[in-house]
Amino acid sequence: MLDPKYLRSDIAEAAARLATRGYVLDVAAVNALEEKRKDLQSRTQELQAERNARSKSIGEAARRGEDVAPLKAEVTKINEELETSKVELDALLAELKVIADAIPNLPSDTTPVGRDENDNVEVRRWGTPREFSFPVRDHIDLGEAAKGVDFKNGVKLSGSRFVVMKGQIARLHRALAQFMLDLHTLQHGYTECYVPYLVNPDSLYGTGQLPKFSQDLFNTGIDGEGEEEGKVRKFSLIPTSEVPLTNMARDEIFDEQELPIKMTAHSPCFRSEAGSYGRDTRGLIRMHQFDKVEMVQLVHPEKSWEALEEMAGHAEKVLQLLELPYRVMALSTGDMGFCAAKTYDLEVWLPAQNTYREISSVSNCTDFQARRMQARVRIDGKPQLLHTLNGSGLAVGRTLVAVIENYQQEDGRIAIPAALQSYMGGLTHIG
């Protein structure tokens, strides 16, 4: 959520910056609602002051032995007007909140301006794509040949965009997640967390999935136990462990010396993939359920840009140790996620597709999520909004795809990257 004070004082500037994201802010409509809010708020305060003054007069008149019935009648009338004014004000504030909740974060000054992914800017590359002396096979063919990727049973058990992994492919998938966690916790300073896979609406609001992106979620329709009577709180499956990790800061005030807080978690992620019809219908690239190792940082508001570069480096280190060629892209304003002020995508080379594909997104959300969550840090004795960052470190399934395709051998076997062999019991090849 953007700063309401900024929207009120610099709405034209905000609208111009949001327009680079393809978001049209109706300035005239917002200004009209704001004027109405100020009038209603002023009227409500005047009525409260008038009621308090009249109520005080009743006590004074009673002490003098005067008839207080006329004054009580006036107070009753004022209370009726006040109640009407409060109802109108609450309705107007709710309308303004609906608008505010739908406004994305402001792009940073260093975010490339563009309409979509075609306007993303390459920042750097690492590694050289391997030249094969034999016809390249894709991960589906290789995985099925190794009897480790079973889409048929995935469809039978659940439907399209699900898979069953078996044998050494399943083991390799597990090894990748363990390797990533060990790297981030032992070398990069993150604390490993095991988090709930079911979260409440407050959590999804805090990290920006609700209310705008409800169609992307899998909702259980089940209430949590012990909730307040009359308050419906449905559980949803997490689309990423960013949601529970970041929301642990909700309604908290940290001391300055506690920051940065760096957390990581390995979890399944559940996404409806609404709007992805016809895209990546084969293989492991776009699934309803996939595993990811997530990184989250809660930082001092003056240090988030430094933290963004650091987090991108942490994700890159995974690919470097696996010796997988990749490139780093700065996303354009039109391609960024809702909460991000700036995002780097890491794209890994997939030989069978002869292109780079996204394997990680690392974003600085500045104070956007923190404002929704009221996550703060005490600086010079005064609570201020902290900054939140999140990034994939990495998407495990897509990393598996990259390893299978980049490490394929002419005889159909899959070589195990040196960094993973200790996690595979010394195994050097699959197949």
Swiss-Prot record:
Alphabetical list of SUPFAM superfamilies matching this protein: Class II aaRS and biotin synthetases, tRNA-binding arm
Q: Where is this region: Disordered?
A: 41-66
Q: Name one GO molecular function term.
A: ATP binding
GO annotation, biological process: selenocysteine biosynthetic process; seryl-tRNA aminoacylation
Top enzyme class of this protein? ligase
Q: In which pathway does it act?
A: Aminoacyl-tRNA biosynthesis; selenocysteinyl-tRNA(Sec) biosynthesis; L-seryl-tRNA(Sec) from L-serine and tRNA(Sec): step 1/1
Instruction: Look up the EC number in the record and give it.
Output: 6.1.1.11
What GO terms fall under cellular component here?
cytoplasm
Please indicate which superkingdom the organism of origin belongs to. Bacteria
* Keyword Secreted in annotation: no
Q: Does the keyword Magnesium apply?
A: no
Amino-acid positions noted as binding L-serine in the UniProt annotation, renumbered to this chain: T240, S241, E242, E294, S392
Keywords, ordered alphabetically = Aminoacyl-tRNA synthetase, ATP-binding, Cytoplasm, Ligase, Nucleotide-binding, Protein biosynthesis
Which transformation does this protein catalyse, written as a reaction? tRNA(Ser) + L-serine + ATP = L-seryl-tRNA(Ser) + AMP + diphosphate + H(+); tRNA(Sec) + L-serine + ATP = L-seryl-tRNA(Sec) + AMP + diphosphate + H(+)
Where is this protein found?
A: Cytoplasm
User: In which broad location class does this protein mainly occur, judging by the first location in its UniProt entry?
Assistant: cytoplasm
InterPro entries (alphabetical)? aa-tRNA-synt_IIb (IPR002314), aa-tRNA-synth_II (IPR006195), aa-tRNA-synth_II/BPL/LPL (IPR045864), Ser-tRNA-ligase_type_1 (IPR002317), Ser-tRNA-synth_1_N (IPR015866), SerRS_1_N_sf (IPR042103), SerRS_core (IPR033729), tRNA-bd_arm (IPR010978)
Q: Where does ATP bind?
A: R271, S272, E273, E358, I359, S360, S361
Q: What is the role of the protein in this entry?
A: Catalyzes the attachment of serine to tRNA(Ser). Is also able to aminoacylate tRNA(Sec) with serine, to form the misacylated tRNA L-seryl-tRNA(Sec), which will be further converted into selenocysteinyl-tRNA(Sec).
Q: How does it assemble?
A: Homodimer. The tRNA molecule binds across the dimer.
Q: What's written under domain?
A: Consists of two distinct domains, a catalytic core and a N-terminal extension that is involved in tRNA binding.
- Tell me its family: Belongs to the class-II aminoacyl-tRNA synthetase family. Type-1 seryl-tRNA synthetase subfamily.
- Return the NCBIfam families for the record: serS
Entry protein name: Serine--tRNA ligase
Q: What is the lineage of its organism?
A: Bacteria, Pseudomonadati, Pseudomonadota, Gammaproteobacteria, Aeromonadales
